[in-house]
């Protein structure tokens, strides 16, 4: 365990000398190699016990991997064995698509932030499902979330068709499914967070889920991932709509379009969503507002800007039942997982 944890700080300067997306791919490849060689397989069992329940699912601990790091579900076991209590992969779209032109990912180290405009680059639903089926994660009793989106060339008026295809495809292979309507990098996608649009989409998804539950004889929870750049009125509208359509969870939040915290830094004016430290306070606001409106009706997963165990605890104190990591892993490495698990285990005593 210590070899892997000490290796990342040593490797980080070399990784940060690379283009951000290239470094991401190199890191995943090396992590997969470490897993295949057995170097990470004890990490999962090295974490303290911090049992939690999320959307009716039993978690070993409430620290999860956020979607986006493994878009194609090709590294589920390697990533999960870093000590996560649950793993979410995707976003996957019905058809393969290349995403936006490169370069499309930028580091802002002084702000512990990233800007990305990846645009749901992925290999498509069939390849995604094949990767998920090869994983041993769920067969070990671990929790896997599958995140679905719409293709860039699907008109927003027909977005529901893509989500329905995605839901039907991933349903048999998921412990929960996340509906991503908050990426800023797919044109007009965030319009689906609006009251009428959201209600119409979720109504269709709930109807399809009921049919799938009957077909597969099991209930798979549905979560919705929302943006941090919402007004109080928009948050309140979402909080009213989610339980009405039987939604089990809400993931708060995706990346922000705000640039206040990174203004003047290199790459700050690049198009795309900001993740990392600048999102922490924004997501806390959304979590607190959601919890005050939802009560216990819908589970909240807190994500955005967690770079320490303390910040994971702040997400939980704001009203989250679980947290997810992504950008913090890039800046802190795999040691962040254990730090967050320990902080939450201590806080639950």
UniProtKB/Swiss-Prot annotation:
InterPro entries from the UniProt entry: Aldolase_TIM (IPR013785), DHO_dehydrogenase (IPR050074), Dihydroorotate_DH_1_2 (IPR012135), Dihydroorotate_DH_2 (IPR005719), Dihydroorotate_DH_cat (IPR005720), Dihydroorotate_DH_CS (IPR001295)
This protein's record includes keyword Membrane: yes
Main location: membrane
Cofactor(s) the record lists: FMN
Subcellular location: Cell membrane
GO MF annotations, alphabetized: dihydroorotate dehydrogenase (quinone) activity
Comment on bound cofactor: Binds 1 FMN per subunit.
Family affiliation: Belongs to the dihydroorotate dehydrogenase family. Type 2 subfamily.
HAMAP family per record: DHO_dh_type2
Quaternary context: Monomer.
Protein name listed in UniProt: Dihydroorotate dehydrogenase (quinone)
Organism: Bordetella pertussis (strain Tohama I / ATCC BAA-589 / NCTC 13251)
């Amino acid at each position: 365990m210590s070899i892997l944890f000490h290796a990342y700080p040593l490797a980080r300067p070399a990784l940060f000398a690379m283009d951000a997306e290239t470094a991401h791919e190199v890191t995943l490849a090396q992590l997969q190699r470490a897993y295949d060689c057995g170097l990470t397989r004890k990490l999962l069992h090295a974490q303290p016990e911090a049992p939690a329940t999320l959307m009716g699912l039993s978690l070993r601990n409430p620290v999860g991997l956020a979607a986006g790091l493994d878009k194609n579900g090709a590294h589920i076991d390697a990533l999960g064995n870093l000590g996560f209590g649950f793993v979410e992969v995707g976003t996957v779209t019905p058809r393969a698509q290349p995403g936006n032109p490169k370069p499309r990912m930028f580091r802002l180290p002084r702000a512990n932030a990233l800007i990305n405009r990846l645009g749901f680059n992925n290999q498509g639903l069939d390849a995604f499902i094949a990767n998920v089926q090869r994983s041993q994660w769920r067969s070990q009793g671990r929790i896997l979330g599958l995140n679905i989106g719409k293709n860039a060339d699907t008109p927003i008026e027909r977005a529901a068709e893509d989500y329905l295809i995605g839901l039907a495809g991933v349903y048999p292979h998921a412990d929960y499914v996340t509906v991503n309507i908050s990426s800023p990098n797919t044109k007009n996608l965030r319009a689906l967070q609006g009251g009428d649009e959201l209600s119409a989409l979720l109504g269709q998804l709930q109807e399809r889920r009921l049919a799938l539950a009957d077909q597969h004889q099991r209930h798979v929870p549905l979560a919705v991932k929302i943006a941090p750049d919402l007004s109080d009125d928009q948050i309140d509208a979402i909080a009213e709509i989610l339980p009405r359509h039987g939604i089990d969870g809400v993931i708060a939040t995706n990346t922000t379009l705000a640039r206040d915290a990174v203004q003047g830094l290199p790459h700050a004016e690049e198009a795309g969503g900001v993740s990392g430290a600048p999102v922490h306070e924004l997501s806390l606001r959304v979590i607190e507002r959601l919890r005050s409106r939802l009560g216990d009706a819908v589970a909240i997963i807190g994500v955005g800007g967690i770079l320490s165990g303390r910040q994971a605890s702040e997400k939980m104190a704001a009203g989250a039942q679980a947290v997810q990591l992504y950008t913090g892993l890039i800046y802190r490495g795999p040691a962040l997982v254990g730090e967050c698990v320990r902080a939450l285990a201590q806080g639950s005593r």
